[in-house]
Amino acid sequence: MINKTLLQKRFNGAAVSYDRYANVQKKMAHSLLSILKERYSETASIRILELGCGTGYVTEQLSKLFPKSHITAVDFAESMIAIAQTRQNVKNVTFHCEDIERLRLEESYDVIISNATFQWLNNLQQVLRNLFQHLSIDGILLFSTFGHETFQELHASFQRAKEERNIKNETSIGQRFYSKDQLLHICKIETGDVHVSETCYIESFTEVKEFLHSIRKVGATNSNEGSYCQSPSLFRAMLRIYERDFTGNEGIMATYHALFIHITKEGKR
């Protein structure tokens, strides 16, 4: 279970540094945007709902791509929205500070889009059902999220450190994510045409501490309410094993497993 109060605090604290460190999130964003560019022309007058807009990176790209659209952008971190509002190309955007899981929608949208956000939801299926109800016929719901292979090196190193020290409890080093098949099952919605694709980005860092620092700087540290690592000696063992087992030619490696989903709402046949 995600602790939303803690998560909100971390994202507010990371607002200033987010864009500098969100390299993978930007790659994921452009994969989503390429789907929209194939589907709509720049003259399209469409209603767009963006969820988890953060500092407005995707928001601004949407505004540039579809200048005749109206965009509603939502995030629950006030500091993130404050930065998004300072971007140059957001004149056709209305910002709202709300929790996606408590969002009450009153109109329908042609496009509902979210980049690297839905992994922070406690009930993804319920959110998808709510969003699908407010999607126009032939509209598209598309989002990216992180998959179960994300940070596999970190999880493997932590598990090996526990085994080395004969620790058998359920402590973890970070959040676990859905597999492609699990996500596909969750996204099966009546009258919806679902497509799921995946890719892995391998990022390199000079040392493990630099990698963990980059995670903190985008606010993405563990916000689960469950048990997590609080032992300094176990943490040091994990760092040592990570650098021993997962160092490549360009430094230590970190896998980001990205899942891309787009669902088209079909009319009655």
From Swiss-Prot:
It catalyses: malonyl-[ACP] + S-adenosyl-L-methionine = malonyl-[ACP] methyl ester + S-adenosyl-L-homocysteine. It is an enzyme of class 2 (transferase). Signal peptide: none annotated. Pathway: Cofactor biosynthesis; biotin biosynthesis. GO terms for biological process: biotin biosynthetic process; methylation. InterPro entries: BioC, Methyltranfer_dom, SAM-dependent_MTases_sf. Keywords: Biotin biosynthesis, Methyltransferase, S-adenosyl-L-methionine, Transferase. One of its GO terms (molecular function) is malonyl-CoA methyltransferase activity. Disulfide bonds: none annotated. It comes from the Bacteria. Gene3D superfamilies: Vaccinia Virus protein VP39. Its EC number is 2.1.1.197. Belongs to the methyltransferase superfamily. Converts the free carboxyl group of a malonyl-thioester to its methyl ester by transfer of a methyl group from S-adenosyl-L-methionine (SAM). It allows to synthesize pimeloyl-ACP via the fatty acid synthetic pathway. This is Malonyl-[acyl-carrier protein] O-methyltransferase. It comes from Bacillus cereus (strain ATCC 14579 / DSM 31 / CCUG 7414 / JCM 2152 / NBRC 15305 / NCIMB 9373 / NCTC 2599 / NRRL B-3711).
